[in-house]
Amino acid sequence: MYVIVEINGQQFKAEEGKKLFVHHIQNAENGATVEFEKVLLVDNNGTVTVGAPTVEGAKVVCEVVSPLVKGDKVLVFHKKRRKGYRKLNGHRQQFTELTIKQVIA
């Protein structure tokens, strides 16, 4: 059984026991449980239920493993040819690591 759930504007395929890295969730504490009720699709052993826009009564219960995980560094380089203009910027995206404890559908 798996579901498609929307978390912070992104859609994820969720199954029990899987780990997810989602965009940083504010005020998330280590070991806290978080529920997401925007379930868009439920596949229960081949029986597919598609929500319009969400499936009623379905939710995903997750546990916060790590509230702040930094992703890989992304480098952004700007250059104007023949002018000597070069600029290098970089950032690391912040994520929250979740473990899916229960899928209720």
Curated annotation (Swiss-Prot):
GO MF term list: rRNA binding; structural constituent of ribosome
GO CC annotation terms, alphabetical: cytoplasm; ribonucleoprotein complex; ribosome
One Pfam match: Ribosomal_L21p
Transmembrane regions listed in the UniProt entry: none
Superkingdom to which the source organism belongs: Bacteria
A GO BP entry: translation
Keywords: Ribonucleoprotein, Ribosomal protein, RNA-binding, rRNA-binding
Function: This protein binds to 23S rRNA in the presence of protein L20.
Subunit (UniProt): Part of the 50S ribosomal subunit. Contacts protein L20.
Family affiliation: Belongs to the bacterial ribosomal protein bL21 family.
Family matches, as HAMAP family: Ribosomal_bL21 (MF_01363)
Protein name as catalogued: Large ribosomal subunit protein bL21
Protein's organism: Phocaeicola vulgatus (strain ATCC 8482 / DSM 1447 / JCM 5826 / CCUG 4940 / NBRC 14291 / NCTC 11154) (Bacteroides vulgatus)
